[in-house]
């Protein structure tokens, strides 16, 4: 799996870099895309290493840097890192919970050239938001933070991860985005990787709820045209075709973890046998072009049928490799979210069954926890 093939496709220039500066976060969201084994503060890259990585990213052709975590403002050097982005001409997007120390650092971030803020909102109702995020009094902090973002003139995107615990609030999220002065709203149905995979039975909505949420979004897009852009990410388990994960494996994006591993996508470490190179040992350009993890599923040569002969193979790039492994037991299989997969009907049935049952309690995201998935036997068995 790891050996680059002699005829491997050339690597296009990456567009975006997700800089996971830390896994520390005041929230404990049960759908978090971070890995189950979270990196500790003691192993995080230092300021100088991040600055070097950003310089290498700019030289490689990266345009956008998403400063993320965890909660990126938990880093004492977040202002220095953001300034480095500005100095290099990299467009910086702060992905934040807006709680803890985020507000206290916002003015300084603006002063050094922060370009954009993406604020997560777990629910419209404060009590529901606190239950989902696992943090008391988070909502007032988020509202105060959002108001300051708008006051400074920074573009604001609200991000709402949708699941059965808040899908009834989709219309409310849209109203909230307008009220807050956001320019964009992401209505992103949960993608079942990381902690969301563990909590799938607690998070899975039913098909009727999903369809209604899509109808609400489409109506709001028309009503609010020119005022609010609404992005919609539909849930894979109810889709006809899969997403192009990260824009296609090793094609557009890369993810640098707090300890310096460079991944083709958030969940890539769930695939056994892949070798992930670290920025402490290799230059970013070398990792992007030649590292075994990035070359493993870049292009189409690795594909099996029906992907290999499908006319969508360079649209969705076979879907998600991590999801194929989780649901089909083979990272090179057709993503079972695709209607052409022999497992597609079983995946839809699994979602329908879980959505019909009473949801179990959330397994909250926690550093140092020994998490085991409560999920039933998967569809590939």
From Swiss-Prot:
Top EC class, one word: oxidoreductase
Catalyzed chemical reaction(s): [PQQ precursor protein] + S-adenosyl-L-methionine = E-Y cross-linked-[PQQ precursor protein] + 5'-deoxyadenosine + L-methionine + H(+)
Record-linked SUPFAM superfamilies: Radical SAM enzymes (SSF102114)
EC number: 1.21.98.4
Keywords, sorted A to Z: 4Fe-4S, Iron, Iron-sulfur, Metal-binding, Oxidoreductase, PQQ biosynthesis, S-adenosyl-L-methionine
Protein residues bound to [4Fe-4S] cluster: 25, 29, 32
InterPro entries: 4Fe4S-binding_SPASM_dom, Aldolase_TIM, MoaA_NifB_PqqE_Fe-S-bd_CS, PQQ_synth_PqqE_bac, PqqE-like, Radical_SAM_PqqE_MftC-like, rSAM
Disulfide bonds: none
Ranges where the Radical SAM core domain occurs: 11-223
Gene Ontology terms describing biological process: pyrroloquinoline quinone biosynthetic process
Record note on cofactor: Binds 1 [4Fe-4S] cluster. The cluster is coordinated with 3 cysteines and an exchangeable S-adenosyl-L-methionine.
GO molecular function: 4 iron, 4 sulfur cluster binding; cyclase activity; iron ion binding; oxidoreductase activity; S-adenosyl-L-methionine binding
Gene3D superfamilies: Aldolase class I
Domain of life of the organism encoding this protein: Bacteria
Pathway(s) the chain acts in: Cofactor biosynthesis; pyrroloquinoline quinone biosynthesis
Names of required cofactors: [4Fe-4S] cluster
Quaternary data: Interacts with PqqD. The interaction is necessary for activity of PqqE.
Function noted in UniProt: Catalyzes the cross-linking of a glutamate residue and a tyrosine residue in the PqqA protein as part of the biosynthesis of pyrroloquinoline quinone (PQQ).
NCBIfam families membership: PQQ_syn_pqqE, rSAM_more_4Fe4S
HAMAP family named among the record's database cross-references: PqqE (MF_00660)
Annotated family: Belongs to the radical SAM superfamily. PqqE family.
PANTHER family xrefs: PQQA PEPTIDE CYCLASE (PTHR11228:SF7), RADICAL SAM DOMAIN PROTEIN (PTHR11228)
Name of the protein this chain belongs to: PqqA peptide cyclase
Species this chain originates from: Methylobacterium radiotolerans (strain ATCC 27329 / DSM 1819 / JCM 2831 / NBRC 15690 / NCIMB 10815 / 0-1)
Name of the coding gene: pqqE
